[in-house]
Amino acid sequence: MAAKDVVFGDSARAKMVEGVNILANAVKVTLGPKGRNVVLERSFGGPTVTKDGVSVAKEIELKDKLQNMGAQMVKEVASKTSDNAGDGTTTATVLAQSIVREGMKYVASGMNPMDLKRGIDKAVAAAVEELKKISKPCTTNKEIAQVGAISANSDSSIGDRIAEAMDKVGKEGVITVEDGKSLADELDVVEGMQFDRGYLSPYFINNPDKQVAVLENPFVLLHDKKVSNIRDLLPVLEQVAKAGRPLLIIAEDVEGEALATLVVNNIRGILKTVAVKAPGFGDRRKAMLEDIAILTGGQVIAEETGLTLEKATLAELGQAKRIEVGKENTTIIDGAGEAVNIEARVKQIRTQIEEATSDYDREKLQERVAKLAGGVAVIKVGAATEVEMKEKKARVEDALHATRAAVEEGIVPGGGVALIRARTAIASLTGVNADQNAGIKIVLRAMEEPLRQIVTNGGEEASVVVAAVAAGKGNYGYNAATGEYVDMVEAGVVDPTKVTRTALQNAASVAGLLLTTDAAVAELPKEDAPMPGGMPGGMGGMGMGMGMDM
């Protein structure tokens, strides 16, 4: 085990604060509409230019172990805020730096760090309650577009695209971001339920131009086992043929003579069918089959429910208006399921989302809700170069997270104004002793900092603007993009409440930990082994002489 360096008290804190400042100073220049760019070196290819705070934070690794600890703690603030709210990483970093900086002054003057932390926590809890009061619901397309634009570093085209996507697939719909093929951004919307399984044989294709199989007004047979014996399928195939409608078979697999017979019937025009594998694996496959059954108004033919293929009737089959089956995807449009049943299923899955412990499970459950409740929209990001594409794609993903957060918890005036208003409301808050009061003061000072930084990045005098905004009321604030004092909500400068709340809570949490740190343990740098000795000196008189006359 390598030897460790143990540092105590002020020495430990001072080094960690240096790391906090290095990281925060690099990140905070990106804040606001006039935020500056940061250039990140890449081990191969050209450098990346970004205005995304979390991208900058992730790149920073310091040589000094103690400085690096401080930097990593603030990096945690940025990434946690990004994970929870999708945006607000730079705001969180600025808040954390301010709380640490002000807090260290009080700790150095001999105040009790634990009481300071209690004061900080008390002020943050009161500020969060105040933010909830200021918050208003985000419902209109215009508001959603504004949130998206602000989060994408004041790019209104990204905000408009996200608002359009949410309008098409609903607030719960799945919106994914992909690399585009052209210079312009594009929006593709898939209505209905889509899952990532395609036809089992290209002979099912009936639209050669698009290379898809299209079934109009089909029945849907859902089975949770493999189908290889055609005799099991014959009774239900005969009933479907009599009804004169096409059939989609979704099963664990369709193989052997069963698949061959379906293909032959399809080619001869006797019965139009398409077979696809069921989506997902294991328990998730059963759940997704159940989802499709509810969407199409059918039942899953499974032994557990006492149903068998041989005895299946048309009543157990689902129905849809139209189904498109491609090489890799199947889309069910306008299933015949009852709206009441679909809503009940969505409610059930939402309960599972709340109880889910892993991010992966939560994401998969949210996808299922979206497929049942809305549809799927794909935003294809267009750019001229690979570097621009990566940077723009990251901004679109940030903006998408932020708009979801806004729909979830509402919006507050942006540009640091919400924190100034919350600050005014809790200015009279007091703790049980002078040290706690100092902790409250630390938070009150920190809540000005995002506005100060936005103004500084815009090249204006921060103190003048902060005083002017603090003297105002409601949504009155400073729009750094235009350099004017306006009603921030009317001007479209808004932030999701969740983003501002999460940034403040995470910043205070990590800053509080730093202030109450009294020892730091880091690995000692390894000493390089001495270089091996050089070759011995040359061999005396072995020059050109060698005793010969030249």
Swiss-Prot record:
Molecular function as annotated in GO: ATP binding; ATP-dependent protein folding chaperone; isomerase activity; unfolded protein binding
GO biological process, one term: protein refolding
Record keywords: ATP-binding, Chaperone, Cytoplasm, Isomerase, Nucleotide-binding
Phosphoprotein is among the record's keywords: no
UniProt GO cellular component terms: cytoplasm
Enzyme kind, highest EC tier: isomerase
Chemical reaction(s) catalysed: ATP + H2O + a folded polypeptide = ADP + phosphate + an unfolded polypeptide
Superkingdom per UniProt: Bacteria
EC number: 5.6.1.7
Record Pfam families: Cpn60_TCP1 (PF00118)
InterPro entries: Chaperonin_Cpn60_CS, Cpn60/GroEL, Cpn60/GroEL/TCP-1, GroEL-like_apical_dom_sf, GROEL-like_equatorial_sf, TCP-1-like_intermed_sf
Subcellular location: Cytoplasm
Keyword Transmembrane: no
Residues noted as binding ATP in the record, renumbered to the chain: 30-33, 51, 87-91, 415, 479-481, 495
Function: Together with its co-chaperonin GroES, plays an essential role in assisting protein folding. The GroEL-GroES system forms a nano-cage that allows encapsulation of the non-native substrate proteins and provides a physical environment optimized to promote and accelerate protein folding.
Family (UniProt): Belongs to the chaperonin (HSP60) family.
Assembly: Forms a cylinder of 14 subunits composed of two heptameric rings stacked back-to-back. Interacts with the co-chaperonin GroES.
Name listed for the protein in its UniProt record: Chaperonin GroEL
Gene: groEL
